[in-house]
């Protein structure tokens, strides 16, 4: 289980698109450029995010999408360009973050592929790290654990707030990261390849959580290479290539073939020859219904002689 008993169909339907009549731009980046050691990583990039949308970022490795997100969250500072954020009154104001804490205080959070969690500390301690409630100069442990429950319930973490993070599954740790974002009143949450270490069931539960967050008015920026995810949960998609923004499209108006073409800069044609399976091939390794303390879903697979088995 990822974060409790969120209902999950075997086949998820397309998640609701944003209402075009009420869409509002809450984040805008214009002319963003960034170089490292005189090597241009971002070249005059524009980007816009609307309220309560899931905006997908696509591009090959090194295309610049993660660098842009790190600029938006204050990890890096741009060489050129401007960033604007909704001021809560319907206006866009220019912002400049010199560190992630400043972005956090403005409601922008990012969950990286490598979680920023202390394994030997509790869920509650991780959620409020650096912002612990204090009473008479000391940490108020009872209040911290009680406050943590609010955010844990929202992402449906099925564990007590005093549970050590090291005892959680990868999916549950991801939920702790999202709970941290929510505890800072996040209006924008950036997820960097969030399903790379999740099982199929955990992925679908994550999608349910994303839909729930959108209903709360939270916008999601979702970095992914997985086409099936993009068409399942995305509202819009922005494609990067070689440090440039190539295009932004409504998911409903594009195709997988079109996105691949935008990513690689040319038409893509499948040229793989058909693989014929030998029914008598030799099994060299087999696992059946394997369960561990951290991964409750049974795992089964067979590896055959002379074949590459992807996991």
Model-derived regions: residue spans:
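N-terminal amphipathic/hydrophobic targeting modules at extreme N-termini
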Residues: 1-14
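Glycine-rich phosphate-binding loops of nucleotide-dependent enzymes
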Residues: 15-311
């Amino acid at each position: 289980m990822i974060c409790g008993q969120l209902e999950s169909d075997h086949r998820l339907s397309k998640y609701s698109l944003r209402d075009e009549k009420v869409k509002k731009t809450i984040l805008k980046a214009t002319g963003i450029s960034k170089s490292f050691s005189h090597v241009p990583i971002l070249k005059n990039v524009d980007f816009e995010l609307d309220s309560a949308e899931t905006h997908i970022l696509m591009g090959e490795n090194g295309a610049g999408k993660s660098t842009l997100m790190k600029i938006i969250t204050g990890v890096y500072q741009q060489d050129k360009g401007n960033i604007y954020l909704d001021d809560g009154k319907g206006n866009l104001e220019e912002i400049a973050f010199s560190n992630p804490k400043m972005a956090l205080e403005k409601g922008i959070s990012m969950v990286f592929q490598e979680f920023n969690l202390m394994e030997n500390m509790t869920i509650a301690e991780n959620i409020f790290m650096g912002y612990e409630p204090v009473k008479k100069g000391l940490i108020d442990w009872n209040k911290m654990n009680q406050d943590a429950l609010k955010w844990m319930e929202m992402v449906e973490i099925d564990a007590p707030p005093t549970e050590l993070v090291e005892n959680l599954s990868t999916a549950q740790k991801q939920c702790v990261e999202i709970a941290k974002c929510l505890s800072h009143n996040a209006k924008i949450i950036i997820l960097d390849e969030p399903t790379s270490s999740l099982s199929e069931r955990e992925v679908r539960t994550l999608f349910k959580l994303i839909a729930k967050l959108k209903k709360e008015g939270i916008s999601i920026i979702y970095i992914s290479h997985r086409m099936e995810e993009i068409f399942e949960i995305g509202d819009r998609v922005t494609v990067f290539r070689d440090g440039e923004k190539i295009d932004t499209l409504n998911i409903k108006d594009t195709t997988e073939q079109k996105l691949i073409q935008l990513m690689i800069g040319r038409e893509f044609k499948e040229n793989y020859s058909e693989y014929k399976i030998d029914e008598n091939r030799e099994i060299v390794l087999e696992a059946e219904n394997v369960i561990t303390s951290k991964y409750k879903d049974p795992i089964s697979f067979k590896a055959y002689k002379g074949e590459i088995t992807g996991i």
